[in-house]
Design a protein with these regions (language model features):
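Predominantly extracellular beta-rich ligand-binding scaffolds that present long acidic/polar faces
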Residues: 1-221
Length: 221
């Protein structure tokens, strides 16, 4: 990914509509940089009032090392800005971000519009669901602020969503309770996915690389 960003379908979608689309696979970013980048299961950066992702899904394993708020990682999109909209869509899988300060979440990493610095131009989420285990992030949006343009969002009660923090010079792993939306159990999640959209994802071959960082949530207490 590096300084360019990456998405399962597109690195950047500007004033574009993506409907009834899906991605299944692994995305790995091992590049170390302080520059901004955006990584998403479907789209790295979704920008513009006419930019829409609708009736879509991503089944992902994302391994990343985002380490600042302008480095974004999301199960559907990394950065959603300038009134762009994700609706009737969901992500499932795992996101393992090995550093602590990125904007990381199961649906969208970052919604705030940096150019206008106004919440009325932030990205929008409607009828979205996160069924994603997340390390060092949140379930729905990775950056929380007042007045977020999010309606009808859902997450899986059984997902492990954690952040690693420092408390009194001790590294502590704590559950992330921000941006959970309406929390559903496993049976409700399955029903809600079908209600949101009924896309089927084609089978793909496993991508094997020497730089893969595996998500191992069994070690989280």
């Amino acid at each position: 990914a590096g300084e360019r960003g990456i998405g399962g379908l597109l690195a950047k979608a500007e004033q574009s509509s993506i409907t009834e689309s899906s991605f299944k696979g692994r995305i790995v970013n091992s590049y170390e940089t302080r520059s901004p980048y955006n990584i998403g299961g479907l789209v790295g950066q979704l920008t513009g009032i006419n930019a829409v992702v609708d009736k879509s899904k991503a089944t992902i394993v994302i391994s990343s090392n985002a380490d600042s708020t302008n480095q974004t990682v999301g199960g559907l999109a990394g950065l959603v800005e300038k009134d762009a909209l994700i609706s009737n869509s969901y992500a499932e899988g795992d996101i393992n971000n090995v550093k602590r300060f990125g904007s990381v979440a199961g649906v969208a990493g970052y919604l705030w519009d940096r150019d206008s610095n106004e919440e009325r131009h932030a990205g929008r989420l409607h009828n979205v669901l996160s069924d994603v285990n997340v390390m060092n992030g949140n379930a729905i949006s990775g950056y929380h602020y007042r007045g977020m343009r999010i309606t009808d969002s859902y997450s899986n009660k059984d997902n492990r969503v954690y952040k690693v923090t420092l408390e009194k010079d001790e590294v502590v792993t704590k559950e992330s309770l921000e941006e959970r939306g309406t929390i559903l159990n496993a049976s409700q999640i399955a029903s809600k996915k079908s209600e949101i959209n009924s896309l089927s994802v084609p089978a793909v071959e496993t991508l094997l690389t020497s730089t893969n960082k595996e998500s191992d949530f069994s070690k989280v207490e």
